[in-house]
Regions:
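Bacterial carbohydrate/catabolite-sensing allosteric modules
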Residues: 10-15, 52-63, 84, 108-115, ...
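Short beta->alpha junction loops
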Residues: 66-73
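N-terminal helix-turn-helix DNA-binding module of bacterial transcription factors
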Residues: 1-32
Length: 168
C-alpha cells in the first residue's frame, strides 16, 4: 500500500540506510569496479595512462581500483588475487613483464583483461614496437650519412623495452 511505502521511505531517510554494495554485486554479478595494476607508479608514462583510464571509466560509471607492484613479481601475483577477491569486472594490467605465472593468475580470475606494454597472444594488448621503432631510427640515421651511430637509451636489462630497442 501507499502508506506502507511512505513509512518505509521515511525509515530509510531517518536511518540513512544504504543498500549493501556487496549484496548488489552478489545479485547483479557486477561490481562496476575495474582493477588497474601498474608496475611503478612514478614512471614517466603511468600518470598519463592512468589519467586516460580514469577519464574513460568515469564516463562508463566504473570505479578504478589502482594497485602498484613496485616492480615486484610476487606482489603482482598477490595483487591479481586481491582483485579477484574484490570481484572486479575487468582488469587493465600495465605490464613490464608478462610471465607464465601472470598468465595463470589472469586466467584464474575469469574476467576480461587488457595488457598494456607487453605483447600477448592470449589477451588483448597495446604495446610499443620498440624494436621496429629503433630499427627505423637507425635506418634514418644511416640514410642521413651517420656512420657511427650510438645507442643511448634504457639499459638492455630493462625488462619492458631494453633488449628490443637495442636489437633494433
Amino acid at each position: 500500500s501507499q502508506e506502507k511505502r511512505q513509512r518505509i521511505e521515511r525509515v530509510i531517510r531517518e536511518t540513512k540506510y544504504r543498500p549493501s554494495e556487496y549484496a548488489r554485486t552478489m545479485r547483479t554479478k557486477k561490481s562496476n569496479r575495474i582493477g588497474v595494476l601498474v608496475p611503478q607508479i612514478d614512471s614517466e608514462s603511468v600518470p598519463k595512462i592512468l589519467s586516460g583510464i580514469s577519464e574513460r571509466m568515469d564516463q562508463k560509471n566504473y570505479h578504478v581500483l589502482l594497485m602498484n607492484s613496485n616492480l615486484s613479481l610476487e606482489k603482482e601475483i598477490g595483487i591479481l588475487e586481491t582483485f579477484e577477491q574484490s570481484q572486479v569486472d575487468g582488469l587493465i594490467f600495465v605490464a613490464s613483464v608478462l610471465t607464465k605465472r601472470h598468465e595463470k593468475a589472469l586466467e584464474h580470475m575469469g574476467v576480461p583483461v587488457v595488457i598494456l606494454g607487453q605483447k600477448s597472444e592470449k589477451y588483448p594488448c597495446i604495446y610499443h614496437d620498440d624494436e621496429g621503432a629503433a630499427c627505423a631510427m637507425m635506418e634514418e640515421l644511416l640514410k642521413s650519412g651517420c656512420r657511427r651511430p650510438a645507442y643511448i637509451g634504457v639499459d638492455r636489462r630493462d625488462k619492458a623495452a631494453g633488449e628490443n630497442r637495442y636489437r633494433g
